[in-house]
């Protein structure tokens, strides 16, 4: 059931890569074997397509949506095998803080500014940078003008934000001094 569905979806993505630049991002990763499994499936699909004479991008990138505390803790290992990371801040925050932001009794605990979440984000970026892979971010935090200076100081490569946040995010980035961002990050991370 699930394996067949996953193989069908992956085959469609690999075939679509012949017509434009796409990347495959594996969600909810908790261990390196999950990434290896997807990479093995894609390699098998590529062999099938070669045998069938069907075109595809032979340099298709496979990365990870970094959104679980387990992925954060394994970021150094995962970065050696992933083509890129995208930090999913909404889920990473919720899972790290063990809260459902929709639950009014604990929603006050949901914050990307929590030191545990900031440390998780910083660790993911550092591990990605060490291995030379691109690290992006999606979720509400990527567009937060108060958080952007920290993300710049940590070395985030790419901000994925909603269309309504693009201009404000670009302005915040353009107006940021890296020296000030790093000073702020040093102060915040010392807490």
Predicted regions and their residues:
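C-terminal helical cap(s) of enzyme catalytic domains, especially alpha/beta-barrels
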Residues: 97-108, 166-188
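Catalytic cores of alpha/beta
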Residues: 70-80, 142-156
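Conserved, mostly hydrophobic/aromatic
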Residues: 13, 24, 67, 78, ...
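Hydrophobic faces of well-ordered beta-strands that scaffold small-molecule active sites
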Residues: 22-26, 62-66, 85-87, 135-139, ...
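Generic long, charged, amphipathic alpha-helical segments
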Residues: 49-61, 98-141
